[in-house]
């Protein structure tokens, strides 16, 4: 029996993985390995030996598939739970603030009601006294003296003053309640303005940090360029020193040759120091032309090239920083997109067939065919074909359908 290439090693690697790292495709690899083991048992002991075991194994693999798929969904659920907890905490804080405000209003209202009740009780008492006095006046035939009449007028005047004072207190408390409401509205507006200012300051702080990083990077680049220029300057100075030494040697050699040629040439050379310098300059130019490492540019041209290179480097660095900044903003905007609500599956919908059942359906058909024909050769051919097609197409069609159902 020929086994399909690539399936057992993949299954073995899936078995060696950590439990938290398993995927649905690893479960399918394990199912393929179990199918191979079933095939070997059928070859050795027949189909009846695993007829009762196979449905249980299929059920266990289905449970494993569901658990693995849920494990991959767990991080997203944790994030949603954290967001829900945060919203609940904010809601509880808001409710607590409203409750405190309501309690304050209730306390003020209770105080006002108590004072109003006291004043009403005083009014009722005064009215009762007034009624008693009126009844006494009706039952008594004795006429009131002028002093008693003035006393009665004083009592009625006192009642009017009490009523006036009560009205003033009620109006004052009503004005205080309105002022408290206006003050609360102003406080809420101040809080909203402070929140907006906080967000604006956070954005400004982020931009300033970005600029500071850019400036620091530019400073580092300038320091590196300074070090490079200093190193180049040192090398140039060393080269100039070596050239000066060679020039001195050449001058000494020329002077020795001229001294050997005779006194006449020495006499001609001594009154013409400018000519010697011109000859030495010409020899130096000839020597430089023969030197393969002679400088091709002037010092000003070299400085211009280095300055242009530094400017281009700084521009490239700024463009890279801006590109990274815009990419981070796009990522933040994508993360701010509201996530769709979780899909609720109705309980009445029938449970779809899992990928494990589809994986073993072909093998179960081969098992029935083996029981009918009693020829093991058909099992070899069918299971080989099943293993190859399952390994090739299991990740594309059946696996994807199983994932969609889950």
UniProtKB/Swiss-Prot annotation:
- UniProt xrefs under PROSITE patterns: RH1, RH2
Name the major location.
cytoplasm
CDD domains documented for this protein: RILP-like
Q: Where is the composition biased (Acidic residues)?
A: 262-280
Pfam families according to UniProt: RH1, RILP
RH1 domain ranges (all copies): 10-97
After translation, the protein is modified as follows:
S-nitrosylation is required for the interaction with GAPDH.
| RH2 domain mapped to chain residues | 294-359
Q: Coiled coil: which residue ranges?
A: 76-258
* Phosphoserine: residues bearing it: 7, 259
For biological process, the GO terms are: epithelial cell morphogenesis; protein transport from ciliary membrane to plasma membrane
Q: Which UniProt keywords apply?
A: Cell projection, Cilium, Coiled coil, Cytoplasm, Cytoskeleton, Phosphoprotein, Protein transport, S-nitrosylation, Transport
What GO molecular function annotations does the UniProt record carry, in alphabetical order?
A: protein dimerization activity
Q: Which domain of life is it from?
A: Eukaryota
The record's region (Disordered) falls at 255-280, 330-354
List cellular component terms (GO): centriole; centrosome; ciliary basal body; cilium; cytosol; nucleoplasm; plasma membrane
Disulfide-bonded cysteines: none
The answer to whether the entry has keyword rRNA-binding is no
Modified residue annotations for S-nitrosocysteine: 47
Its quaternary structure?
Answer: Interacts (when S-nitrosylated) with GAPDH. Interacts with RAB8A; interaction is dependent on the phosphorylation of 'Thr-72' of RAB8A. Interacts with RAB10 and RAB12; the interaction is dependent on the phosphorylation of 'Thr-73' of RAB10, and 'Ser-105' of RAB12.
Biological function: Neuroprotective protein, which acts by sequestring GAPDH in the cytosol and prevent the apoptotic function of GAPDH in the nucleus. Competes with SIAH1 for binding GAPDH. Does not regulate lysosomal morphology and distribution. Plays a role in the regulation of cell shape and polarity. Plays a role in cellular protein transport, including protein transport away from primary cilia. Binds to RAB10 following LRRK2-mediated RAB10 phosphorylation which leads to inhibition of ciliogenesis.
Family stated for the protein in its record: Belongs to the RILPL family.
Record-given protein name: RILP-like protein 1
Q: What organism does this protein naturally occur in? A: Mus musculus
Phylogenetic lineage: Eukaryota, Metazoa, Chordata, Craniata, Vertebrata
């Amino acid at each position: 029996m020929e086994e399909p290439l690539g399936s057992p090693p993949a299954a073995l690697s899936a078995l060696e993985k950590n439990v938290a790292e398993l995927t649905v495709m690893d479960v399918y690899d394990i199912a393929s390995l179990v199918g191979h083991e079933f095939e070997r048992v059928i070859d050795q002991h027949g189909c009846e030996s695993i007829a009762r075991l196979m449905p249980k194994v299929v059920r266990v693999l289905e449970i494993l598939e569901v658990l693995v798929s849920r494990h991959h969904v767990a991080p997203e659920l944790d994030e949603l739970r954290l967001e829900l907890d945060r919203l609940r905490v904010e809601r509880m804080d808001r409710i607590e603030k409203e409750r405190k405000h309501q309690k304050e209003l209730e306390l003020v209202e209770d105080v006002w009601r108590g004072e109003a009740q006291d004043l009403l009780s005083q009014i009722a008492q005064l009215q009762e006294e007034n009624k008693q006095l009126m009844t006494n006046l009706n039952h008594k035939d004795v006429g009131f003296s002028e002093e008693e009449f003035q006393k009665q007028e004083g009592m009625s005047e006192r009642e009017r003053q009490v009523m006036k004072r009560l009205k003033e207190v009620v109006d004052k408390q009503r004005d205080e309640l309105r002022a408290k409401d206006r003050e609360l509205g102003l406080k809420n507006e101040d809080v909203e303005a402070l929140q907006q200012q906080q967000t604006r300051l956070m954005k400004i702080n982020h931009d300033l940090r970005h600029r500071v990083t850019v400036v620091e990077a530019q400073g580092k680049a300038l320091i590196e360029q300074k070090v490079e220029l200093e190193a180049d300057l040192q090398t140039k100075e060393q080269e100039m020193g070596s050239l000066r030494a060679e020039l001195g040697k050449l001058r000494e050699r020329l002077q020795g040759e001229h001294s050997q040629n005779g006194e006449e040439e020495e006499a001609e050379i001594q009154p013409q120091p400018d000519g010697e310098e011109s000859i030495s300059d010409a020899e130096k130019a000839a020597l430089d032309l023969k030197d393969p490492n002679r400088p091709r540019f002037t010092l000003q041209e070299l400085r211009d090239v280095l300055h242009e290179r530094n400017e281009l480097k700084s521009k490239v660095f700024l463009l890279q920083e801006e590109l990274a900044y815009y990419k981070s903003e796009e990522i933040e905007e994508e993360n701010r997109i509201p996530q769709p609500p979780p899909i609720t599956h109705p309980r009445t919908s029938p449970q779809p067939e899992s990928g494990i059942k589809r994986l073993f359906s072909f093998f179960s058909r081969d098992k029935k065919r083996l029981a009918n024909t009693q020829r093991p050769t058909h099992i070899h051919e069918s299971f080989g074909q099943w293993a190859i097609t399952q390994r090739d197409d299991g990740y594309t069609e059946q696996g994807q359908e199983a994932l969609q159902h889950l």
